[in-house]
Amino acid sequence: DDITLKQVAVNSSNLMEGMCIKGVLGHFFFESHGIDLTKEDAILNNIELSDTHVQVMLADTTETPKDTTDTALNWKVTLHTLKLKNVSVDLQMPLDSMGLKAHIGNAEIADAAADLKHQFYGWRKFLLTGTSVNYDTGGPGSAIGFDPSHIALHDIRMGIDSVMYYGRDMNAVIREFSMYERSGLSVTSLTGRLFADSTVIRIPSLKLLTPHSEMNL
């Protein structure tokens, strides 16, 4: 019913053409009390991942053959709890000098569901804290002020609850969002709600605060 892995070293070497994965998996815990392969139904009770750091190198320039198979995916997955702590991913693409790094301090998802047959997705609660993202492309060094080729976000905090996506319908509650960028650009607070269907998108009670401005919709 559960799997635990601790201090696992990962090195894909040459097993995957055009891709190399290296890293350390500090602690991984997986608990499930209901996976039915026949009915394509899975209940994932608890997933925890911590102290994990992975580097991904992409160098594949070959064209992937088009998949012409037609296999229906009817899986229905229910996830009760997912927790991440001190997890980082370093994505490098040397052939086009692009790099993307992300570090997650803490992240938690509660009561998530995905129904692939009916294209229904959602979760009750999502919280992300202590997170940073760095994006770099082109040569080294960055311009003064905001540089879209060298973006460095830190102290990202995000809380999005009551998310539902079904067909063209979407609901979400932006409970909190804040972040800072190395250039000085920052979002002190962003809150609001989102409703959308095939004809309209509404964002009532949207409130954006920065250190020097405020916007309400």
What are these regions (language model features)?
Residues D1-L217:
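N-terminal targeting/secretion presequences
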